[in-house]
Amino acid sequence: MEVLPGLLRLLAALVVAERWARDTSGAESLGLWPLPFAVDISPRSLHLSPNNFFFGHSPTSKAGSSCEILQEAFRRYYDFIFGFYKWHQGSYQLCFGTELQQLQVHVESECDTFPSISSNESYVLHVKGPEALLRANTVWGALRGLETFSQLIYQDSYGTFTVNESEIIDFPRFPHRGILIDTGRHFLSVKTIFKTLDAMAFNKFNVLHWHIVDDQSFPYQSINFGVLSSKGSYSLSHVYTPNDVRMVIEYARIRGIRVMPEFDTPGHSRSWGKGQKDLLTPCYRKQVLSGTFGPINPILNTTYNFLSKFFKEISTVFPDEFIHIGGDEVDFDCWASNSEILQFMQEKGFSQISLNSNLCTVFKISNMISAMKKRPIVWQEAFDGRDKFMPGTVVQVWKIEDYKWEQSLITKAGFPVILSAPWYLDLISYGQDWKNYYEVEPQDFPGSDKERKRVLGGEACLWGEYVDATNLTPRLWPRASAVGERLWSHKDVRDIHDAYSRLTIHRCRMVRRGIAAEPLFTGYCNHEHRM
């Protein structure tokens, strides 16, 4: 990660002094989350007045007042800092002393349009009255710095908004820090997705993995194949219109979050078949049609003609460079029961008919995606140890059994990895299971340093069989926050007791901001008596 020019000496001094991410006394009391790389919080305090504080652009910033992303962020964070107490009749006073009147934001590059896997999210925060300074290479780093700045501010015993003089240098450990939501099993309203994106920004996640369709329903309203949702959705009101999709992408964009769509193939596709004739494989029982259908039919030209047109649409609707094409949990029995598929695969010389049918299908689709100047992501079943995928294909590891060995095999073959196996948040248990997620080390597997660097990051997955809008938010948060810190903070940030103290405060902060995050354990939030 590139660090801002002119700050390398300060960073080196912090590292030599071993102050980075280890002296957490101030961070613990404030609940900074995820913990920044380098934190130096002074006991000297500054006061803020809601009527006399504002965010502004540095005169030399290349992303100025015309940058909509920053202008929107200034409005959001002013409200996060002061708004709750306004609307809940909280009292605040301005005591004598130095007043912090402004946070100036300086961005080294012009206002970007969309974040990407290579976006620089580093920032430096210098808080000293009467003006604080936030410096970042990009607007995406500025957004992360604004979140940290908002976490520094608290109310003292007199109700005065207060911030301690601080120096913070920060950047993420991994570039891919995702949350997976599943709208194929249960439809989630756009409003619910917005709330998830808000919480993601509070925890510095930067990828919404949208598993948008599945066997049970097809809620994505295609521009070119509208019959897919009209026949495959739960109902005509359980669809995401093109405008809905645009709103989700835009809401995510101005928070520095990428939206990565997943359309799982060739399995998990029963809902597709309701609107696309001959797409699915007819299954047989004792050489007689059973009346059921299996995965996408891998031997018909019409299959690939349709998929090519469909994914061409997806590549234009979703601006992100990645498209997830699935490749997991394919019902091989149906393929093996179909004599036409058996004959086709035998003619191709495939010995493992079912496995090779899957690989053949996924390989063709991944080539389609690559031809569209996008990068495919697949689940680990699509990887068989051969370098058959296009360069740049990413493999997502989800099976908990031997997942470290799986990471080793994939990275040794030269492919990047996204880790999800230890972070399936839909698997709930009694107690503080967030600690299990927190203690995961994504690069702890047999391999060279070069191979470990192929880990792009990870995702916390919340599959939707038992999750809808009523329980999505409390099941995600603050359990996903543990994953967020593991993917953002330095690998040596592992003190579970310190994490508990900070996460307890951070959870209350999320609740104060409207996120129904469940409690970690017994206790209360300080803001409750004001409600």
Swiss-Prot record:
Residues the record marks as carrying a glycan: 120, 164, 301
Identify the Gene3D superfamilies for this entry.
Chitobiase/beta-hexosaminidase domain 2-like (3.30.379.10), Glycosidases (3.20.20.80)
For this protein, the record's InterPro entries field holds: Beta_hexosaminidase_sua/sub, Glyco_hydro_20_cat, Glycoside_hydrolase_SF, Hex-like_dom2, HEX_eukaryotic_N
Subcellular localization, per the record?
Lysosome; Cytoplasmic vesicle, Secretory vesicle, Cortical granule
Q: Which UniProt keywords apply?
A: Cytoplasmic vesicle, Disulfide bond, Glycoprotein, Glycosidase, Hydrolase, Lipid metabolism, Lysosome, Signal
Q: What is the uppermost EC class here? A: hydrolase
- Enzyme Commission code(s) on record: 3.2.1.52
GO CC terms: cortical granule; lysosome; membrane
Which cysteine pairs make disulfide bonds? Answer: 67-111, 283-334, 508-525
The record's listing under Pfam families reads: Glyco_hydro_20 (PF00728), Glycohydro_20b2 (PF14845)
Give the residue range of the signal peptide. Answer: 1-21
Regulation of activity:
Addition of GM2A stimulates the hydrolysis of sulfated glycosphingolipid SM2 and the ganglioside GM2.
Picking any one GO molecular function of the record gives: beta-N-acetylhexosaminidase activity
**Function description:** Hydrolyzes the non-reducing end N-acetyl-D-hexosamine and/or sulfated N-acetyl-D-hexosamine of glycoconjugates, such as the oligosaccharide moieties from proteins and neutral glycolipids, or from certain mucopolysaccharides. The isozyme B does not hydrolyze each of these substrates, however hydrolyzes efficiently neutral oligosaccharide. Only the isozyme A is responsible for the degradation of GM2 gangliosides in the presence of GM2A. During fertilization is responsible, at least in part, for the zona block to polyspermy.
Q: Which family does it belong to?
A: Belongs to the glycosyl hydrolase 20 family.
Q: How would you summarize the oligomeric state and partners of this protein?
A: There are 3 forms of beta-hexosaminidase: hexosaminidase A is a heterodimer composed of one subunit alpha and one subunit beta (chain A and B); hexosaminidase B is a homodimer of two beta subunits (two chains A and B); hexosaminidase S is a homodimer of two alpha subunits. The composition of the dimer (isozyme A versus isozyme S) has a significant effect on the substrate specificity of the alpha subunit active site.
**This protein's name:** Beta-hexosaminidase subunit beta
Q: Which organism does this sequence originate in?
A: Sus scrofa
